[in-house]
Curated annotation (Swiss-Prot):
Signal peptide range in chain numbering: none
Catalyzed reactions per annotation: DNA(n) + a 2'-deoxyribonucleoside 5'-triphosphate = DNA(n+1) + diphosphate
GO BP, one annotated term: DNA repair
UniProt superkingdom: Bacteria
GO-annotated molecular function: 3'-5' exonuclease activity; DNA-directed DNA polymerase activity; nucleic acid binding
Recorded name of the encoding gene: dnaE2
Organism: Xanthomonas campestris pv. campestris (strain ATCC 33913 / DSM 3586 / NCPPB 528 / LMG 568 / P 25)
Recorded family membership: Belongs to the DNA polymerase type-C family. DnaE2 subfamily.
EC code(s) of this entry: 2.7.7.7
Name this polypeptide is given: Error-prone DNA polymerase
DNA repair as UniProt keyword: yes
HAMAP family: DNApol_error_prone
Gene Ontology terms: cellular component: cytoplasm
Keywords: Cytoplasm, DNA damage, DNA repair, DNA replication, DNA-directed DNA polymerase, Nucleotidyltransferase, Transferase
Length: 1082
């Protein structure tokens, strides 16, 4: 069986990501057109509307997407399709889009199973019924944990007591119908209750039909046909069965009655339905569908307005705050062009009705600043002068070129996007403020849809098909990041599987189908939705996994479709690091700075940046960025803006990086075809590096602001299979009409297409560059405080605590070395702290850098509560001995062992062996007989150097002793393996043999299978480039080594040093049990 045969019939998205939903629908519509032949007799078939259908948002139940379901319904000639996911509207917006694309009417509904077993579907009839359905779902979801719901009859009755229901109820009788269930539903919904007859050829359908019709007549309840649809087509049954097995955590072979007996729960052709149901029941479904007139797109949303004080309108209050912010930002008066820009923006904001949204974001930022929480806006909102005046963003509009259309325009039919970063350790305070301010009834986080990826899908599928755990692990590894461009067939074969095995083929085929299939809802990283009325009237709300969090059932794409505004409160670790560093500098060094008041354009800082001495700083710490820095040689702030943006897939794939560097280095002349283009591209030497520049170029050519924004969207869509050809034709015509040469037009368009692979807006890059400069200045001038703050902000960033400490201790020609003291129970707090040194007095008298005392937070297995007890007891009086420590700090066995293994007791008892012995005999209480003689101390020999280093890494994650490679250096010399110092003395192009600890593996999407590896020895980091053919040949050594040896060619060009690997092999055996952290494929 071939690979293509195995996945025949399995829908696959285009490579590189999912297409926009509308295009996905269109593609599947075309596929369905090929699948179903429309005959002239179609009009004579019975009409039908499917009123009970689950999509893939009935997680692990429905096998098909809304797009697939509507495409199928369209070609079967259905008049309507109800999406009735179980106690959920999570997939309903996708249903709306699919309905628009196909013309098949969408009916909004949901399926429920009550605690007593009663099953029914609610369908929305009108605008009154929609909030009723949302409220029922919310009640059920809020009464249970994440991913579950709980509803009883009392809760349902309470929602419809004393109100006219705006919904219809379809009773779903079981195999043994209980008339009392139907009677109860009829009491609640009266004539709006119906009996759904669902026939699936699983038993005697004729007998069941007769029994259900008699039951309906007995109850005085109308009956209609429905399908309990769980898949678009019959061939999807294997996927539905697999999802059932995953849901029940059973192998398929053990699922038994959990599986459907056949594939009848698909959208069946009307001819088949006409042979199964009486035409009257089919017609009843159509008639009920016609009564469901609710249009989801007409849902009204009102933003909260309580922030507006009495006597003000939202517009007048926003203007007042903006003008006050202008006076604060520009004490001497704002420039005339800024005033004009702000007036223009306020007029546009009022026209779009977004004043309350801006006021909300400003209020959240105001709260954070009042609490001392660092925050900063980013993204396209940094194009707004109003956002700058309000203190939301940090990019001064008088110092940069703004393009408001990138953020908001009159023609743009979608909400503005304002992203604000907060310290990652304190963002929860901000989220809880929003909940408190607006109430949990009116505020909730947006959802994120967690979808299957290759690795997670194959794990679940293989388990469902009964593969043993060891084989599942092998198969899952075939989908790992490190496989590069190795064909899947080769990966499978190398893992020891036979592609001719039908079981393996079936697992792989189902896995392919489940790629991007929704698995569950999670919470968005920080997107808040706030409403003037209870959110549960607008969209169902459910509990998140985290305590004190609630989420709505729609994700950010749904919100955009429904034109709902969200406030993005995001978490950024570097803000935590900078705030902690500034606190340390203020408290220990006597320098009171904020990000805004740090000395600007500091030559020493830029000199450090040019040497790529940027471990731990913001954004420019990655391998690719560090390789760019010596070539670009930033000398001013705008260079940092370019640096942030240039190492992105868009500029790389658009072939903008090398031309820019050649022009910057003087190897290529800079020219412009017109003054208009020079005005747009002058600062980037004629090369478009930012999204705003692309939009400005086409506006210059004749596009409107709205058309330019549509081009931006098309650029992103092009990467996922969209069509850029209409834009190519129009841009060519417009620019040719302005006299531009065809070569220039083609070059510009190719660069435009490159932005489809992700390019930064300049506003976003400028916002990030502020933090780049701040972190670099602190690293250069306050290296101890910066390293300490960085350690205290972990986990974050690219580098482990070990690498941060190694870098601080090593120093550089541009930066002082920092002394680091070990963890010590007599001196360490929870956090790492600064000790010693002398305060800063002036640039002429900068004082002396302090040392860092490692904190007890670095100790594996030691909780913060235990450390709080240790510090509190130590503050009362010094510890007399180990027994006193254990007694007064109430240390349990786990804490005692953690302290001993970490070497945190050496100042009390000597070496690590002595500490282990002492802790082994201690209890956290005094002896029963106070006069009992103390046990005689035993003198134990100190561990060997290698044992100490191994224990350090195991217990603390780092070592202040010799670097492991220093211990191994004699063996390296025997093998003629060089260290970094010897390597740096070699000429460009030399053949070399090196080895080091693996600290990073990266495979950028633009690298065509090339893997970049960072090795570390006692002198620093070695950057290794592994071409795809070698990565495939030496995959195991490349991906599994802790200590990797490389033979290759040493290269040094424009200050950038790296090793081109010719061969590599694993030396991890030399490390013994030592486990070292490596940051792989992030």
């Amino acid at each position: 069986m071939s690979w293509d045969d195995a996945i025949d019939g399995v829908d696959r998205d285009t490579p590189g990501g999912r297409m926009p939903r509308g295009w996905t629908v269109a593609a599947r519509l075309r596929a369905a057109n090929d699948d179903i032949t429309h005959a002239a007799v179609a009009d004579t078939l019975p009409a039908y509307a499917e009123l009970h259908c689950l999509s893939d948002f009935s997680f692990l139940r429905g096998a098909s997407s809304a797009e697939q379901l509507f495409a199928r319904a369209h070609h079967c000639g259905y008049s309507a399709l109800a999406i009735t996911d179980e106690c959920s509207l999570a997939g309903i917006v996708r249903g709306l889009e699919a309905s628009r694309a196909t013309g098949v009417q969408l009916i909004v509904g949901s399926e429920f199973t009550l605690v007593d077993g009663t099953r029914f579907v609610l369908l929305v009839e009108n605008a009154h019924g929609y909030p009723q359905l949302c409220s029922v779902i919310t009640t059920g979801r809020r009464a249970a944990g994440k991913g579950a719901y709980r509803l009883g009859r009392a809760e349902v009755e309470a929602h419809f007591r004393d109100v006219v229901p705006g919904v219809f109820a379809l009773w779903l009788p079981g195999d043994q119908p209980q008339a009392e269930q139907g009677a109860w539903l009829q009491r609640v919904f009266a004539e709006r209750a119906f009996l759904a007859v669902e026939l699936h050829r699983e038993q005697d359908d004729a007998a069941r039909l007769q029994a259900l019709q008699a039951l309906a007549q007995q109850l005085g309840m109308s009956a209609l046909a429905s399908g309990d649809v769980q898949m678009a087509q019959r061939r999807d049954r294997i996927v539905q069965d697999t999802l059932t097995a995953i849901r029940h955590t059973l192998p398929l072979a053990d699922c038994g009655a959990h599986l459907f007996r056949n594939g009848e729960r698909h959208l069946r052709p009307r001819r088949a339905l006409g042979n199964i149901y009486p035409h009257a029941l089919l017609q009843a479904s159509v008639e009920l569908a016609q009564r469901c007139t609710f249009d989801l797109s007409k849902v009204q949303y009102t933003y909260p307005r309580e922030l507006v004080p009495q006597g003000h309108t939202p517009a007048s209050y926003l203007r007042q705050l903006t003008e006050a912010g202008m006076r604060e930002r520009w004490p001497e008066g704002a420039p005339a062009q800024v005033v004009a820009q702000i007036d223009s923006e306020l007029e546009l904001i009022a026209y779009k009705g977004y004043e309350a949204f801006f006021l909300t974001v400003q209020d959240v930022v105001r709260f954070a600043r009042a609490q001392g929480i660092l925050c900063q806006g980013r993204g396209s909102s940094a194009n707004s002068a109003v956002c700058y005046a309000l203190g939301i963003t940090a990019v001064n509009p008088s110092e940069t070129r703004l393009l408001m259309a990138r953020f908001l325009s009159k023609e743009r039919d979608e909400p503005p996007d304002i992203d604000v970063d907060f310290e990652h350790e304190r963002r929860e305070e901000v989220l809880q403020y929003v909940y408190t301010k607006y109430g949990r009834e009116r505020a909730a986080l947006a959802a994120t849809v967690i979808c299957y990826r290759g690795k997670s899908a194959v794990r679940d599928v293989a388990k469902a098909f009964g593969l043993p755990p060891d084989q599942i692990a092998l198969l899952a590894n075939c989908y790992g990041w490190g496989n590069g461009d190795t064909p899947m067939e080769q990966r499978i074969a190398e893992a020891g599987f036979d592609l001719a095995n039908p079981l393996i083929n079936k697992i792989l085929a189902v896995t392919e189908h489940l790629r991007d299939h929704p698995r569950h809802l999670s919470q968005h990283v920080g997107g808040f939705v706030i409403s003037d009325e209870p959110l549960s009237m607008l969209v169902p709300v459910e509990n998140a996994a985290m305590a004190d969090r609630t989420i709505i059932q729609w994700d950010k794409d749904d919100l955009e479709t429904m034109k709902l505004l969200k406030v993005d409160c995001l978490a950024l670790g570097m803000l935590t690091c900078i705030r902690k560093t500034l606190d340390l500098v203020r408290g220990h060094r006597g320098r009171d700075y904020t990000i805004a008041t740090l000395p600007g354009e500091d030559a020493a800082t830029y000199k450090m940046i040019q040497r790529a001495d940027t471990v731990g700083v913001f954004q420019i710490e990655s391998r690719a960025q560090m390789a760019m820095l010596p070539r670009l040689k930033p000398r001013e702030f705008y260079d940092l803006v370019i640096e942030v943006a240039i190492v992105r897939p868009g500029p790389i794939q658009g072939d903008m990086v090398h031309p820019y560097l050649r022009r910057r280095q003087g190897y290529e002349p800079v020219s412009f075809p017109s003054p208009g283009v020079e005005e747009i591209l002058g600062r980037t030497l004629g090369i478009p590096l930012f999204q705003e520049q692309v939009m400005e170029l086409v506006i210059h050519a004749g596009y409107t602001d709205s058309e330019a924004d549509q081009l931006r969207r098309s650029m992103a869509a092009w990467r996922r299979g969209g069509d850029m050809e209409p834009h190519r034709v129009r841009i060519r015509e417009l620019m040719a009409g302005r006299g531009y040469a065809p070569e220039f037009i083609d070059q510009i368009f190719e660069q435009i297409k490159g932005f489809g692979s992700y390019g930064f807006p300049q506003s976003h890059a400028a916002s990030f560059a502020k933090l780049v400069y701040a972190s670099c200045w602190l690293k250069r001038h306050e290296p101890a405080a910066f390293a300490c703050g960085l350690l205290n902000a972990q986990p974050m960033g690219f580098y482990s605590a070990s690498q941060i400490v190694q870098d601080a201790r090593r120093g550089s020609p541009e930066r002082q070395r920092v002394e680091v003291l070990p963890v010590d129970v007599l001196h360490s707090d929870w956090d790492n702290i600064l000790v010693g040194g002398r305060p800063w007095h002036s640039d002429a008298d900068p004082g002396e850098q302090p040392a860092i005392r490692l904190g007890l937070r670095q100790v594996s297995g030691l909780s913060e509560k235990v450390v709080e007890r240790i510090v509190a007891a130590r503050a009362q009086r010094p510890f007399a001995d180990i027994g006193d420590l254990c007694l007064r700090a109430a240390l349990d066995e786990k804490a005692r062992l953690a302290l001993a293994e970490a070497g945190a007791l050496q100042s009390m008892v000597g070496n690590r062996n002595a500490a282990r012995w002492a802790m082994a005999g201690v209890e956290a209480r005094r002896p029963l007989l106070p006069g009992s003689p103390a046990e005689r101390a035993v003198e134990l020999p100190a561990p060997r150097a290698g044992e100490e280093i191994l224990a350090d890494y195991r217990a603390v994650g780092l070592s202040l002793r010799q670097h492991p490679m220093a211990l191994l250096r004699p063996q390296m010399l025997q093998r003629r393996i060089l260290g970094l110092r010897e390597l740096q003395a070699r000429r460009h192009g030399s053949g070399v043999h090196v080895a080091g600890l693996v600290t990073q593996r990266q495979r950028p999407a633009t690298a065509k299978g090339t893997i970049f590896v960072t090795l570390e020895d006692e002198h620093g980091m070695i950057n290794v480039i592994v071409w795809s053919h070698l990565a495939m040949r030496r995959r195991r050594a490349l991906l599994e080594s802790r200590l990797l040896a490389v033979r290759g060619r040493w290269e040094r060009v424009d200050g950038v040093e790296h090793l081109i690997a010719g061969d590599l092999y694993d030396l991890s055996d030399l490390l013994g049990e030592m486990q070292l952290p490596s940051r792989d494929f992030h």
